Curated annotation (Swiss-Prot):
Keywords assigned: Chloroplast, GTP-binding, Initiation factor, Nucleotide-binding, Plastid, Protein biosynthesis
GO molecular function, one term: translation initiation factor activity
Recorded name of the encoding gene: infB
Binding, GTP: G180, H181, V182, N183, H184, G185, K186, T187
Primary location: plastid
Lineage top rank: taxon: Eukaryota
UniProt-recorded name of the protein: Translation initiation factor IF-2, chloroplastic
Pfam families: GTP_EFTU (PF00009), IF2_N (PF04760)
């Protein structure tokens, strides 16, 4: 701790601006003017008044500190999204707008990401697992979907190598979708497998709905779920729904019909 003229104590590390002023060539003239004014006002007090200088210095430091705090708050609020350590849990069938609220970004930012990947959506459209995975990779966030019905958590990160406990994994019958053009024998093949006459119950012997059948195979009576689909062009949306839930796709092409 140092002293100047035994009037003001200061810390050399904190009062650089004051030291500059002290070393300035105009300091002596300022000192003389101040002493002259003090003598005029009060002859008993001939000391230089450091209080006003100290007050100005403190005001300057306060403004500077306030600016630094505001700047830190600004940059913290505008940081890039980085949720690698945190997991964002979302429910199935979440919309773009709902996901944006969960992440804390504008819905337009998510739409931009999807648009760059050739996906044209609006804020009210539902995001499937593949789109959530795409958003997760582009925004570098960890999104996990929650299947409340089966109490399953699905992590969308493709590079996430989490250890799965076999005790919590339930075996289920694989779902096989049977696809093909109309009159190529999809339903006829299924009825041979399940030993049931299905075509007689169909209008015009043409499948116009999704048919689900259980097929037993192997010595241990393992089950396979067969999904029969309509082959007509008008039922494209039905086939798309089947594709989303299927594990295996079986494409049927009749040899006598050709491709």
């Amino acid at each position: 701790m140092n002293k100047i003229n035994n009037n003001l104590e200061f810390n050399g590390n904190e009062d650089e601006h004051f030291i500059e002023y002290y070393n300035n060539k105009n300091y002596k003239s300022d000192l003389l003017k101040a002493n002259k004014n003090n003598k005029t006002k009060n002859k008993k007090n001939s000391n230089f008044n450091f209080k006003s200088i100290e007050k100005n210095r403190l005001n300057y430091n306060n403004k500077k500190n306030k600016f630094i705090l505001n700047r830190k708050a600004y940059y913290n609020s505008n940081e890039n999204i980085n949720c690698q350590s945190d997991i964002i849990y979302v429910e199935e069938n979440i919309t773009v707008n709902e996901l944006a609220s969960k992440i804390g970004v504008e819905a337009t930012e998510i739409l931009k990401v999807l648009f760059k990947k050739g996906k044209l959506l609006n804020i009210n459209q539902i995001l499937d697992l593949s789109l959530l995975n795409l958003i997760s990779q582009e925004l570098k966030i960890n999104i996990t979907t929650i299947d409340k019905k089966n109490n399953i958590y699905i992590n969308t990160e493709s590079n996430n190598d989490q250890n799965i406990n076999d005790k919590h994994v339930k075996l289920r019958a694989p779902i096989v979708a049977v696809l093909g053009h109309v009159n190529h024998g999809k339903t006829s093949l299924i009825e041979k497998l399940i030993k049931n006459d299905l075509t007689k119950a169909e209008t015009g012997h043409i499948t116009q709905h999704i048919g689900a059948y259980e097929f037993i195979i192997g010595p241990k009576d393992k089950k396979i779920i067969l999904l029969d689909t309509p082959g007509h062009e008008a039922f494209e949306s039905i086939r798309q729904r089947v594709l989303k839930i299927s594990d295996i796709i079986l494409l049927i092409i009749a040899a006598d019909e050709g491709i």
